């Protein structure tokens, strides 16, 4: 109602493993926020440009009122950005009364690196299709290895974002992620490390194909 100014959500969660939105979740958020005049903000710091060129909002077809993006827009250099619909962004100075600035805003090196990265992405034919196929090939290999070892796993993927859960049930939220087998993850992590493959040391981290 009138007491809720904004709803902010990761359209693809990235800090409890890679947890995908269930069917209808984002659509319901969009419908209800529009109904009550509440601003819908997508935190695409992790999924922006990783799920596809237009981020998770492009992949799932849900357009928020505002979007937050992280260092991926700097081509790996420290950078961040936010944007939104005209009526919201017009409130930012100098057009509006909300002042936002900093000594690192618009850093030339980070902005140049980010621009070059985005131009490369747009010019490489089938860039995201290739990236997604590479990710799927890796996950298919993990599934085959797990089946051969008799270990129950779930793999999640959205574009180039992915992770593996040691669980025999679907992982739909934080509680499901916490219920996964941490001992099996630790054994898997150490086994991979012994083979010269360094992964994030936490089951709550999302991995990215490059």
Label the predicted regions:
Residues 1-210:
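Conserved N-terminal phosphate-binding loop of PLP-dependent enzymes in the Aspartate aminotransferase
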